[in-house]
Amino acid sequence: MILDQLVQASQQRVQKVPVRERVKRIQQARKMTTPVLSFEAMLAQPGLQLIGEVKRASPSKGLIAAEFDYLQIAQDYVAAGIDAISVLTEPRYFKGQLSYLQAITQTVSVPTLRKDFIVAASQIASARIAGASAVLLIVAILTPVQLQAFITLAHELNLSALVEVHTTAESKQAVAAGARIIGINNRNLKDFSVNFATSCQLRQAVPAECYVVAESGIQTATQAQQLAAAGFDAMLVGETLMRAPDKGQAVMQLRAGVRG
């Protein structure tokens, strides 16, 4: 299973860092007073917000961008009016780096999200140190105790937690753990298949007090309009934008008829 491999690789990377260094990283993040752009304030804006992803590769699609000027991509997104940027930092399967997140965060004027397979508190701390506004937490790879602890830590570090779910049961688990932002992933992480209908099917299971983000498989303005009509606060779009030669045009096409 692809997900098991991703989690195992993430755990191995964490374990390569000495425990003392991991503790020091968390302590450093706790002491930081540098303000970050608010991810939740972005989601609170009227209309359907667009989160553009910076992603070089994926397990299902292989190499997406042979030429990968990640800073230019981020700047193109911002110039096109993107509302936030998601940065893949997973190195083995997505060819990402934490340094990409840090450089992009220092360059752009919109909130950034660390997208990775987070399995340890030190990874959340590293996101804060890199300047991110939010971290992705995946319900499917965390125990209820871990999920609650990681959401709490993120909030203590002034980070938002985008808590990703794929089923109604996971959505309930996320809410019980204290999630304020729910990301509904149309992609099944067990086999990486995509079903766009998942978003709208699960939307009604998310309480009104939570922000809700649709993830994966979003390619057209019609889909964006469906998400807006269903009451989503944002959509996270990766491959569609990454493959577009004119990212500004791609952003405009996705937003056609959608206020955001």
From Swiss-Prot:
- Quote the EC number: 4.1.1.48
Q: Which Gene3D superfamilies match?
A: Aldolase class I
Molecular function (GO) terms for this protein are: indole-3-glycerol-phosphate synthase activity; phosphoribosylanthranilate isomerase activity
Question: Its annotated pathway?
Answer: Amino-acid biosynthesis; L-tryptophan biosynthesis; L-tryptophan from chorismate: step 4/5
Its keywords, alphabetically, are: Amino-acid biosynthesis, Aromatic amino acid biosynthesis, Decarboxylase, Lyase, Tryptophan biosynthesis
Q: Where along the sequence do coiled-coil regions lie?
A: none
- Amino-acid biosynthesis as UniProt keyword: yes
Q: Name one GO biological process term.
A: L-tryptophan biosynthetic process
CDD domains per UniProt = IGPS (cd00331)
Looking up Pfam families in the UniProt record yields: IGPS
Listed InterPro entries? Aldolase_TIM, Indole-3-glycerol_P_synth, Indole-3-glycerol_P_synth_dom, Indole-3-GlycerolPSynthase_CS, RibuloseP-bd_barrel
**Catalytic reaction equation(s):** 1-(2-carboxyphenylamino)-1-deoxy-D-ribulose 5-phosphate + H(+) = (1S,2R)-1-C-(indol-3-yl)glycerol 3-phosphate + CO2 + H2O
Q: Which PANTHER family does the annotation name?
A: INDOLE-3-GLYCEROL-PHOSPHATE SYNTHASE (PTHR22854:SF2), TRYPTOPHAN BIOSYNTHESIS PROTEIN (PTHR22854)
UniProt record similarity statement: Belongs to the TrpC family.
Q: What is this protein called?
A: Indole-3-glycerol phosphate synthase
Q: Which organism is it from?
A: Lactiplantibacillus plantarum (strain ATCC BAA-793 / NCIMB 8826 / WCFS1)
Gene designation per UniProt: trpC
